Amino acid sequence: MADVQERLKKLGASARIGYVLVNFFFSQASIGSRWKTGKGTPRRKMKRAPARSGGDDKKLQQTLKKLNVQPIQAIEEVNMFKSDGNVIHFAAPKVHAAVPANTFAIYGNGEDKELTELVPGILNQLGPDSLASLRKLAESYQNMQKADGDKEADDDDIPDLVAGENFEDKVE
């Protein structure tokens, strides 16, 4: 234990001597000019692009490759009917299919559209569920038209007011 304490004293003494020697060799002016610190030019902030989901796309492509998907040519549009009556519409999509696995991949920009926007062109694509929703839509449209017609009929009962006349005088 005493041996360790002696070594520590020697280390402390040599460190103090080295410190004095450093001050002895370098004057304060030369130390200040050599080790001058400052901000200099600030670091430039990097503008980061948003993270892309490239990893997900690669995994999807690998999985589709395992399923042995084949491209299907000459598909002009794809419509997916949602339960709320709206349609997801893909114009000129890329379609790949793996028929044995019952898997279809559709690539493209999908747009949410209402059924009324696509009605003339998609009547032959509608199944029984979609036809029922189309009937409901037509009924609601007719009800709206009837309600508008009723409002116009009610307007006939109300007399027009002219400036300078009193409403009560017109009613009597």
UniProtKB/Swiss-Prot annotation:
The keyword Ligase does not apply. It is found in: Cytoplasm; Nucleus. CDD domains: NAC_BTF3. It comes from the Eukaryota. Residues 36-58, 142-172 are annotated as: Disordered. GO terms for molecular function: unfolded protein binding. It holds the Pfam family NAC. Signal peptide: none annotated. Its main location: cytoplasm. Residues 54-119 form the NAC-A/B domain. One of its GO terms (cellular component) is cytosol. Keywords: Cytoplasm, Nucleus, Protein transport, Repressor, Transcription, Transcription regulation, Transport. GO terms for biological process: 'de novo' cotranslational protein folding; protein transport. Residues 41-50 have a biased composition (Basic residues). Part of the nascent polypeptide-associated complex (NAC), consisting of EGD2 and EGD1. NAC associates with ribosomes via EGD1. Component of the nascent polypeptide-associated complex (NAC), a dynamic component of the ribosomal exit tunnel, protecting the emerging polypeptides from interaction with other cytoplasmic proteins to ensure appropriate nascent protein targeting. The NAC complex also promotes mitochondrial protein import by enhancing productive ribosome interactions with the outer mitochondrial membrane and blocks the inappropriate interaction of ribosomes translating non-secretory nascent polypeptides with translocation sites in the membrane of the endoplasmic reticulum. PANTHER family: TRANSCRIPTION FACTOR BTF3 FAMILY MEMBER. Belongs to the NAC-beta family. This is Nascent polypeptide-associated complex subunit beta. It comes from Pyricularia oryzae (strain 70-15 / ATCC MYA-4617 / FGSC 8958) (Rice blast fungus). The lineage of its organism: Eukaryota, Fungi, Dikarya, Ascomycota, Pezizomycotina.
